[in-house]
């Protein structure tokens, strides 16, 4: 697979925002999502992640073909606020729908691992939804293991 990586530009913002918003919306547990107004949620979420999407706290990378066809993107930065050792962190990884299942996600995660290694990090982490079995399978095949689990309990 011939993949070119380049820094994201402002011209990429629209597709990155749309993809991120849809991915996160889909990951919200169903019992929470039914109570949310999509437009209000998007406005709230945009405020929360703007520094990450703008690249203020992260590096945004686009994967594309030699003909500049979008394959996916990855947003990388530093994590590790639980321990004193800084770690690489994959804030978002997204693959174009027509490229899923073709190795692009695996390529992006391996590329992100190299990115972290080159910066001296000894570990890279990410967060994935319990319901995203396909992504979890890719991450586990690349050596990622579950370390923490977020749990929720409805109070109604």
What residue ranges belong to the model's regions?
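Conserved GNAT-fold acetyl-CoA-binding loop/helix
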Residues: 21-48
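Conserved beta-strand in the GNAT
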Residues: 60-62, 69-78, 89, 94
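A conserved beta-turn-beta hairpin within the catalytic core of GNAT-like acetyltransferases
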Residues: 69, 79-90, 100, 147-148
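Conserved beta-strand-loop-alpha-helix junction that forms the acyl-donor binding cleft
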Residues: 97-100, 122-135, 152-156
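Conserved active-site alpha-helix within GNAT-family acetyltransferase domains
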Residues: 102, 106, 110, 118, ...
